[in-house]
A protein has these predicted regions:
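Short, Gly/Pro- and small/polar-rich lid/capping loops
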Residues: 42-68
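Subset of Sec-pathway N-terminal targeting signals
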Residues: 1-46, 147, 159
Length: 312
């Protein structure tokens, strides 16, 4: 491909982005932000959650996962209600090749497929915290069966200990998903949690861009670009969190890019976050790459029906 064709192809490329609005409490909520003394955690391990010993039982893992359909102008797919994962997304207007009958481009794929690639949000406990938080096996309920541009979807899960977790998901006319995380606390005491978001890739792709195009983990934090390789994540991952790279800052974005496609998460641009790249070995030469953000200041939700952080 000559340079002119390359530039045209790049200009025509689509971008899949997910915006996460962390720190926007509604005025009537009893939410209070405060700086906790403990350090900000990295992204939780894949398929791991908090203390779920007192949580309601999850659905039978042998049954097909319940899903919410996605149908917008430029994309279609579905959202997995087990784990609240955005893991099935196809671009309606782009094909893999120029040949007749070529399949549409798939940018997100579930964990049980050959090339898993997905986006996930959640909450992590502060040090010493014991809130039962949703994990990869939590089955959420949805208020609608289909997510469209005109119809956002809200997912809910009650942990049985007084806290109700909610995730509101909306999509625009292009490729942007707006995701709002909210906790309603009916317990008697305040709870402190770190919201997080991440792009997860469960395989090592064959890189095709050469020296002209970066492929792999990428981020911009405090207006500074960082590009890393899959190899550097595998070599640099340090137990117990298997974090290979981290940077604290304000706003920005982070994700994993291919030759033409990018999946990224975008925190609220005035929020203090820690961006991380990590690699979780899963056996043999296989593993999972995670790129994302964790809030540096925990979400503190007052008891007695206090709630936060919903979009205003």
């Amino acid at each position: 491909m000559d340079i002119k064709r390359f530039m045209v192809a790049t200009a025509l490329s689509a971008v899949v982005l997910v915006g996460f609005e962390y720190f926007l409490p509604q005025q009537n909520h009893k939410t209070v932000e405060q700086q906790a003394p403990n350090a900000t955690p990295g992204l939780p391990p894949v398929a791991a959650g908090g203390n779920t010993s007192a949580a309601p039982p999850v659905a039978d893992a042998s049954q097909p996962d319940p899903r919410v359909a996605i149908d917008a102008d430029r994309v279609h797919g579905s959202l997995d209600l087990r784990g609240a994962r955005l893991d099935d997304l196809v671009l309606k207007n782009y094909h893999e090749t120029v040949k007749a009958g070529s399949p549409l481009v798939r940018v997100l794929e579930p964990r049980d497929q050959a090339e898993p690639n997905l986006v996930e949000v959640g909450w992590a406990n502060v040090s010493g915290g014991h809130v039962s938080v949703p994990d990869a096996n939590t089955v959420w309920t949805a208020d609608h069966d289909t997510l469209t541009q005109a119809q956002p979807v809200t997912l809910s899960w009650d942990n049985g200990q007084g806290q109700v977790f909610q995730i509101n998901i909306a999509i625009d006319q292009n490729y942007m998903f707006a995701v709002t995380q909210k906790v309603i606390n009916h317990g008697g005491e305040a709870v402190s949690l770190y919201p997080f978001s991440r792009v997860e890739r469960g395989y090592t792709p064959v890189e095709t861009g050469g020296y002209l195009v970066h492929e792999g983990p990428i981020s911009v934090i405090d207006h500074k670009l960082d590009e890393s390789s899959y190899k550097s994540l595998r070599k640099g991952a340090v137990p117990p969190g298997n974090i290979a790279w981290t940077k604290a800052g304000q706003g920005g974005w982070a994700g994993i890019t291919d030759k033409y496609w990018l999946s990224a998460v975008i925190p609220q641009q005035d929020s203090d976050v820690a961006g991380t790249y990590s690699y979780q070995p899963t056996g043999g030469d296989k593993g999972v790459y995670d790129v994302g953000f964790t809030a540096r200041t925990p979400l503190v939700v007052a008891g007695g029906g206090g709630g936060g952080f919903a979009r205003p």
